[in-house]
A protein has these predicted regions:
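Short helices/loops that flank or line small-molecule/ion binding pockets
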Residues: 42, 47, 65-76, 92, ...
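A conserved helix-loop-strand patch within extracytoplasmic ligand-binding domains
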Residues: 102-161
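Sec/Tat signal peptide C-region and signal peptidase I cleavage site
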Residues: 19-23
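Short helix-initiation/N-cap motifs at beta->coil->alpha
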Residues: 35, 57-69, 166, 187-199
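Extracytoplasmic "Venus flytrap"
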Residues: 26-44, 59-63, 167-170
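Ligand-binding cleft/hinge of the Venus flytrap
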Residues: 44-52, 147-187
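Beta->alpha turn/N-cap motifs
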Residues: 60-64, 74-87, 104, 165, ...
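Bacterial N-terminal signal peptides
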Residues: 8-18
């Protein structure tokens, strides 16, 4: 597997400060469109329901911008999020705090409380680091052990197709960051954008 650390981010839950765990007010539980988001969202949903809390299922609502917009607009009460995304929520990508999970958590927790009245709950011991993986046979045949090797191989015309989420293809801290850092550019024909795709 070829991988590089771009942003550090612990998994935390974002909840509206006014989250009313009252039977009369169902808790609107959301998640992102990806499989991981759906799994985490369903865990939240089941935990709340097992404690007698009424819920509204908004699992797999959309991409990060869609879900973020929903919680800031009051359309969601809770969803799982990675602290590193705070860099983009607050247009503060160059702050070194985002490269440290604990510092990033403290920063986004403070900013969201002040600016959006959102509360970040205690983070889970999880990490969401963007990576690019290649098949073992491709790596062995072409001597690919790093992203620098992959870049050099691509620049020589290596036959490559990347399957990735729309977010990985679009977000500035994902594929565009890899392309910039390692000096390669994938053509549209080399990209297979998974569910919820936004073509570039």
């Amino acid at each position: 597997m070829i991988k590089a650390r771009i942003w550090s981010g612990a998994l935390a839950l974002v909840a509206l400060v006014s989250l009313p765990l009252q039977a009369a007010e169902p808790v609107k539980v959301g998640s992102k469109i990806d499989t991981e988001g759906a799994l985490l969202g369903n865990i939240i949903l089941q935990v709340l329901e097992s404690h007698g809390v009424k819920t509204v299922n908004k699992i797999q609502l959309g991409t990060t911008p869609v879900v973020r917009g929903a919680i800031t607009a009051g359309e969601l009460d809770i969803y799982p999020e990675y602290t590193g995304n705070g860099a983009f929520f607050f247009k503060d990508e160059n702050d070194p705090a985002w490269k440290n999970a604990q510092q990033g958590y403290e920063k986004v927790k403070t900013l969201d409380a002040q600016k959006n009245k959102l509360i970040w709950l205690t983070p889970a011991p999880a990490n969401n680091t963007w990576t690019i993986a290649v098949r073992q046979d491709l790596a062995e045949k072409n001597h690919l052990t790093s992203l620098a090797d992959l870049s050099a191989w691509l620049q020589k015309g290596g036959d490559f197709k990347l399957a990735a989420s729309a977010e990985f293809i679009e977000r500035p801290d994902a594929l565009p960051a890899f392309e910039k850092a390692y000096g390669f550019k994938l053509k549209q024909s080399q990209l297979l954008s998974l569910a919820g795709a936004i073509r570039r």
